[in-house]
């Protein structure tokens, strides 16, 4: 009887410890061929994004949301989730930096999530009614699809070691010597590589983050923002905001625009005006090998 009681006590303690550590039954999804194969898995996505909404397309999935991609990555590594939704370029960036990670290469509207171009594309956001939308649309239209793709490939490579010299001319650039038309204040997270990230030097064309000493922003969004500002004859200033504060920043006039890997969803279009998309991507799921 004493042995039974002791065994039960040990089992109870083990269960308590498992619960305290966020223990759960993990699901191996490494062989998933489509999102239907994720049934029963615990999948994360960033709060307030289409990624999170898209998880409702999977029957029986356990959905978890986190404030940013650093939290998602930490949750995956700790075992709190089996995977998390990201754009394909983000997956390439993350997995290139950590050989323990991989991703499920789903294709939108095929093996992957059902989504429109607006839901999986990224665009620049302006305050509702801004006449800048039409102007910037004309600039975006000048950028060929091949250039957009080449720039993203460069940013994935550059993001692996942001402060090291990148001895290659970027696919997208413009003369920024003329800034007679004022300042273009652009907000982004500066924490969503390869779209935008923070580094400690101005290497490879990084832009100083306003209000942050010795911190610089770089990435795909930064390159596009630099191009737009140069074509407008404006000086570019980059501001770092938490994701949930980006729209409020442009609504209040604290910044002029958002370039933050943000998709022009119906909900967001009720709050701000978007340009045409300057990049489109498949949604994939990052996992541990």
Residue ranges and their predicted role:
Residues 21-22, 63-65, 103, 175-176, ...:
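Conserved beta-strand scaffold positions in the cores of enzyme catalytic domains, especially
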Residues 22, 47-49, 115-165, 222-231, ...:
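Extended ligand-binding regions for polar small-molecule ligands
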């Amino acid at each position: 009887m004493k042995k039974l009681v002791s065994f039960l006590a040990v089992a109870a303690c083990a269960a308590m410890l498992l619960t305290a550590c966020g223990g759960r039954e993990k699901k191996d999804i490494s062989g998933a061929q489509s999102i239907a194969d994720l049934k029963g898995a615990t999948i994360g996505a960033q709060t307030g994004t289409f990624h999170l909404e898209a998880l409702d397309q999977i029957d029986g999935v356990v959905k978890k949301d986190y404030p940013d991609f650093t939290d998602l990555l930490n949750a995956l590594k700790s075992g709190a989730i089996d995977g998390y939704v990201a754009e394909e370029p983000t997956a390439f960036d993350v997995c290139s930096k950590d050989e323990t990670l991989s991703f499920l290469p789903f294709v939108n509207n095929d093996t992957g999530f059902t989504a429109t171009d607006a839901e999986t594309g990224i665009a620049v956001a302006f305050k509702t009614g801004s006449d800048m939308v039409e102007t910037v649309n004309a600039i975006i239209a000048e950028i060929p699809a091949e250039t957009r793709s080449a720039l993203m490939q460069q940013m994935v490579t550059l993001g692996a070691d942001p402060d090291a010299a990148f001895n290659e001319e970027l696919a997208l650039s413009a003369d920024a010597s003329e800034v007679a038309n004022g300042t273009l204040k652009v907000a982004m997270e500066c924490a969503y590589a390869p779209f935008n990230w923070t580094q400690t030097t101005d290497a490879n064309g990084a832009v100083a983050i306003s209000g942050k000493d010795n911190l610089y922003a770089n990435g795909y969004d930064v390159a596009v923002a630099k191009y737009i500002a140069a074509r407008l004859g404006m000086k570019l200033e980059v501001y770092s905001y938490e994701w949930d504060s980006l729209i409020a920043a442009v609504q209040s006039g604290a910044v002029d625009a958002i370039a933050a890997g943000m998709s022009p969803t119906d909900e967001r279009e009720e709050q701000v005006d978007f340009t045409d998309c300057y990049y489109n991507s498949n949604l994939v799921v990052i996992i541990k090998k």
